[in-house]
Amino acid sequence: MWELVCLLLLILAYLFWPKPKTSDAKFPRSLPFLPLVGSLPFLPRHGHMHVNFFKLQEKYGPIYSLRLGTIPTVIIGQYQLAREVLIKKGKEFSGRPQMVTLGLLSNQGKGIAFADSDDAWQLHRKLALSSFALFRDGDQRLETIICQEASSLCDLLLTHNEESVDLSQPIFMSVTNIICAICFSTSYENRDPILTTIQTFTEGILNCLDNENLVDIFPWLTIFPNKTLEKIKRHVKVRDEVLIDMLEKCKEKFNNDSISNLTDILIQAKMNADNNNTTDHQGSFSDSHILSTVGDFFGAGIETTTSVLCWIVAFLLHNPEVKKKIQKEIDQNIGFSRTPTFNDRNHLLMLEATIREVLRIRPVAPMLIPHKANIDSSIGEFTIPKDTHVVINLWALHHNEKEWDQPDRFMPERFLDATGSHLITPSLSYLPFGAGPRACIGEVLARQVLFLYVACLLQRFDLDVPDGAPMPCLKGDPKVVFLIDPFKVKVTVRQAWKDAQAEVGTWRP
């Protein structure tokens, strides 16, 4: 009986459900879809979504569509089309779909990462980018801050010589200090409880954000109890309490003649808007807006960088010959009398190539945060109506056999010329930080952190698989960030480093 009722309801829904505008022949070819549920019944149920979407290109081509519930969504898996969306028509596709889970993270669309492309978003993005200008010179120079934290991390690891360590925890704490310096001009000792609190709510939020949150597809499901949403709310509450405390301290110390961090810039912008009575901007600088922008720096800057550093270590454990080549470069070009600097990138070519290859083979976000068409537009030969969601499958771009030789193989040398003496870009199908109006604002920071941290680690330590332990799993866990499964590494102080420090009397076993 119930089966007949359900069948009848489906038939009626199909007959009377409003036909979408996207039925136009010029709209990208679509997966099958049903009323209400869309294409969900026809999507693969196992494996990583970015890989499944890549495989669907074999049948549907480099651009195709599907329906997530009733929402028309276009999937892009070719770099020419991706660059059209991100760069050539970046403003037309700079919108962000509003989702229940991301709304909780962004105080309902505030900040930068998940905000729609309105005036407030543009203003906060501009101010966030301007904050990096504060860290160009002097003691606040960004490279100086990074090197100090990298050295502190290495000093901590010295106390674990010849031990098996999960590097993710100390790296997370170290990178958090860099973000705290940029946002608040503060830093913390490794054992400070505030760092543990930040790690707890950051990882808690990430664990709640995956590709199976049906409430983002069917928002009406919020009328029912939802454990995931409750967890997100709890973690966001803790996050906001921490950031509010830091914000209030910045307000107390604020000096309009001494702007030293991102929060100072936002406070100053709020004061200017209030003093000039510019009503267009006054509403953009509530504490909620400021907290969301600062929160985006924490959410997008810490776990992403930590994850990539762990991926780099994992691939070096799988490819020890690459690690030895990098250490040889370090020994020959830097030695042991000074800390590596970002200028050394011109000489540590294998290290830079390794970083680029890891960002290719395991992109931070295999599917970039979805975009939304702000107006009726087009991609290639296809018409794209306003409000259509557009997903760039970065995994497809980075694993296209037409663009990359043996794309599933780790080959840093692909980013070097035939002589190994110059860095190259072997394909335009490479967008590890996105591009256009929605490009990652922390790209410069991330590249410096990745280079300097790995250089410092390999200058001082040998990193090996612990005796009897398995190799790190390279499959990964794709959430908002492509995480690697936890693993341990044996940390051993290099003999060459010991000898060099002993000569100048700084080595203490």
Curated annotation (Swiss-Prot):
Regulation: Regulated predominantly by intracellular cAMP levels. The 17,20-lyase activity is stimulated by cytochrome b5, which acts as an allosteric effector increasing the Vmax of the lyase activity.
Primary subcellular site in the record, as a coarse category: endoplasmic reticulum
Keywords (A to Z) from UniProt: Endoplasmic reticulum, Heme, Iron, Lipid metabolism, Lyase, Membrane, Metal-binding, Microsome, Monooxygenase, Oxidoreductase, Steroidogenesis
Subcellular location: Endoplasmic reticulum membrane; Microsome membrane
Substrates-to-products reaction catalysed: a C21-steroid + reduced [NADPH--hemoprotein reductase] + O2 = a 17alpha-hydroxy-C21-steroid + oxidized [NADPH--hemoprotein reductase] + H2O + H(+); progesterone + reduced [NADPH--hemoprotein reductase] + O2 = 17alpha-hydroxyprogesterone + oxidized [NADPH--hemoprotein reductase] + H2O + H(+); pregnenolone + reduced [NADPH--hemoprotein reductase] + O2 = 17alpha-hydroxypregnenolone + oxidized [NADPH--hemoprotein reductase] + H2O + H(+); 17alpha-hydroxyprogesterone + reduced [NADPH--hemoprotein reductase] + O2 = androst-4-ene-3,17-dione + acetate + oxidized [NADPH--hemoprotein reductase] + H2O + 2 H(+)
Single GO MF descriptor: steroid 17-alpha-monooxygenase activity
Xref: SUPFAM superfamilies: Cytochrome P450
Pathway: Steroid hormone biosynthesis; Steroid biosynthesis; glucocorticoid biosynthesis
Keyword Ribosomal protein appears in the UniProt entry: no
Domain of life the protein comes from: Eukaryota
One BP term from GO: steroid metabolic process
TM region(s), chain numbering: none
Keyword Oxidoreductase listed: yes
E.C. designation(s): 1.14.14.19, 1.14.14.32
Purpose: A cytochrome P450 monooxygenase involved in corticoid and androgen biosynthesis. Catalyzes 17-alpha hydroxylation of C21 steroids, which is common for both pathways. A second oxidative step, required only for androgen synthesis, involves an acyl-carbon cleavage. The 17-alpha hydroxy intermediates, as part of adrenal glucocorticoids biosynthesis pathway, are precursors of cortisol.
Record-stated family: Belongs to the cytochrome P450 family.
Name of this chain's protein: Steroid 17-alpha-hydroxylase/17,20 lyase
Organism: Peromyscus leucopus
